């Protein structure tokens, strides 16, 4: 490559912190304050036990131009139920989640689906399962490629189906028959090309034949899909992108089974989920389209996304109501794993100390494998973890309540709370000045004015090892 060609490929951009930031005082929104504190807790879990003054000092140090008082920090944490022993009732939506019997599901030999009043629909062991045993493996019911790679896909630099970055040249792809003969997109393998063959043309090719846009029986408007795809990329809205692909696959399934299976999953409206966000000021994953705005702005975003969504499916406008759109988005958000939807895996309920390990393949189209993390008894429920078990119990509870609508009461959560209480109770409170004076006076009365003379140790020449105190030590100087 010549120097001139290289120069054309290089773009000089300005880094955010190279531009001087505003130094004037800024009054942050209450959600900004609470989200900042939650971020501090995530970065350093030990800060969760700090008092309000120290926590306020960290916030001020991190955001020096914020005009936020210690009193306001305390008020906001109390308002959103983020202070210890708070009496504030926190919003949950587990009771709003519904599910139905899953039709046409082929389960592994050792497990069965059981519906209970407390846990809802779950997977239970029919027979004893040994630790380390492969219980089942499955490929996605709905595969969702990475939204972030869309521009690379459009230029043939990533696989049109799985989104995998391509190292081969376009020429070699053409020789292998992996290039599309209509658009610039290519596939990484014959397998991906085969999996993508039915839907690729419907989503992306009609735009190249304007006459087809006049066909009344067309179930997918590719031009509208490409517009929606760009919109999702701009807004970082993975859930909207995902449900568009899911509904396209549902329309292509002439048996109607995929639609029934998706509707049978744990189902909740996205606007209900958003209430949990507002009640805690904690953030959803930004890709889910749920954490960027206050309620009024969020409603506007949903409406705009809905209008773009229904334009993609011109023959389904009577069926696709705004209410159903929100249900589809909420259902996707609480059931997806690594952005994809798995039929059997979606039945696994949560436990912070799960008895299964779910291993997703680095090759995303290959799906996942579920192993027994320990011996599982016959009749025992199979569980997975929705959050990182290594996080503090408070952080796990926040994430579970906002993203899945419930407050976990598993044994690990109970034990973690007990451990925290024991640690707090074992800490000796700092002595007050009056207590120190009383201690000194009592010591003087006991030993007299001359004090105690300490003789040097008989063995010298070796430095004593330092003593590490686990309790607080009071040093007194005259």
From Swiss-Prot:
Q: What is its EC number?
A: 2.1.1.-
Reaction equation(s) it catalyzes: L-lysyl-[histone] + S-adenosyl-L-methionine = N(6)-methyl-L-lysyl-[histone] + S-adenosyl-L-homocysteine + H(+)
Q: Could you tell me the keywords of this UniProt record? A: Chromosome, Cytoplasm, Methyltransferase, Nucleus, S-adenosyl-L-methionine, Transferase
This entry carries the following GO cellular component terms, namely: chromosome; cytoplasm; nucleus
The family database entries (InterPro entries) matched by this protein are listed as: SET_dom (IPR001214), SET_dom_sf (IPR046341)
According to the entry, every stretch annotated as the SET domain falls at: 109-387
Cross-referenced SMART domains, in alphabetical order?
SET
A Pfam family annotated for this UniProt entry: SET
- Tell me yes or no: is Methyltransferase among this UniProt entry's keywords: yes
Major subcellular location class: nucleus
Q: Annotated Gene Ontology MF terms?
A: histone H4K20 methyltransferase activity
Q: Which GO terms describe its biological process?
A: methylation; negative regulation of gene expression, epigenetic
Q: What does this protein do?
A: Histone methyltransferase that monomethylates 'Lys-5', 'Lys-8' and 'Lys-12' of histone H4 (H4K5me1, H4K8me1 and H4K12me1, respectively), thereby controlling gene expression and remodeling chromatin structures.
Homology family: Belongs to the class V-like SAM-binding methyltransferase superfamily. Histone-lysine methyltransferase family. SET5 subfamily.
State what protein this is by name: Histone-lysine N-methyltransferase SET5
Organism classification: Eukaryota, Fungi, Dikarya, Ascomycota, Saccharomycotina
User: What gene name is listed for this protein?
Assistant: SET5
